[in-house]
Design a protein with these regions (language model features):
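N-terminal intrinsically disordered, cationic/polar leader segments
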Residues: 2, 11-75
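Conserved helix-adjacent loop modules within structured domains
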Residues: 5-6
Length: 75
């Protein structure tokens, strides 16, 4: 499935690009990804996380029938 492949590439590629993996609780299940930061992300990781979110939201805009993005952010 095209949507699944796109989401997988964005998420796995993005998570692999994070510099400080120990700073995150990451849960990946069939059709579900959750990432919780233990502390503030460094500048590099913030850009990576913003890129993941933007990419997923773009996929969602085009394929609303197949994907739903939910964000919870605390500042």
């Amino acid at each position: 499935d095209l949507v699944c492949a796109a989401v997988s590439a964005v998420v796995i590629g993005g998570l692999n690009s994070l510099e400080n993996h120990a700073n995150y609780f990451i849960e990946i299940k069939d059709g579900y990804v959750s990432l919780n930061a233990k502390s503030l992300a460094n500048d590099h990781d913030e850009v990576v996380l913003d890129t993941i979110i933007t990419s997923l939201l773009t996929i969602e805009q085009n394929y609303r029938k197949y994907i739903k993005i939910t964000q919870e952010r605390t500042d």
